[in-house]
Structures are given as structure tokens and as C-alpha cells.
Amino acid sequence: MAKKSLNETSPVARFEQSLEELEQLVQKMEVGDLSLEQSLTAYERGIGLYRDCQQTLEQAELRVRLLTDPARPELAEAFEPPSLDG
């Protein structure tokens, strides 16, 4: 079977790939070895990846809301993750 391209992979796989690439870009930028042009290019790419991840998360939240109450998804309460403070 042929390998799937990025556009044919699942939203979860694309999200994970985007997040991994974003983390790698952040690490490169934090080291500080990039030129100004490279930093700007990395920043621009990072913003695009961030927006892709954010959109995927918003779509996932909508799916959860639709599954929770298909008749009235707008009334579903927003998911609040548990606090890690203890």
C-alpha cells in the first residue's frame, strides 16, 4: 500500500506532526544560533503551525460538544482540564 501524504493523514496525525515540528522550531530559536533571516523564517513557520494546531483543537472541541449534546452543542460546557497545581 502506498504511503499517505501529509494531506491524506488523519487530523490527529497532522496535529502531532505540526506540534512536533513546532517544538523543534522553538528549540532551534531558543539556542540562538539562527541568523535573523532564519529566525524570521522559523517564526513565520511556527505561527502557521500554531494556527493549524489551534484549528485542529477547536474542531476537536466542536466534535466533543456535538457528541455531548447533538441537539444543542452551543449549550455544552467548555472542557476545563484538571489543575496541575495539586
UniProtKB/Swiss-Prot annotation:
Catalytic activity reported: Exonucleolytic cleavage in either 5'- to 3'- or 3'- to 5'-direction to yield nucleoside 5'-phosphates
Superkingdom of the source species: Bacteria
One example of a Gene Ontology biological process annotation: DNA catabolic process
A GO term, aspect molecular function: exodeoxyribonuclease VII activity
InterPro entries: Exonuc_VII_S (IPR003761), Exonuc_VII_ssu_sf (IPR037004)
The protein's Enzyme Commission number: 3.1.11.6
Keyword match Zinc: no
Keyword Cytoplasm included in the entry's annotation: yes
Subunit structure, as described in the record: Heterooligomer composed of large and small subunits.
Protein name: Exodeoxyribonuclease 7 small subunit
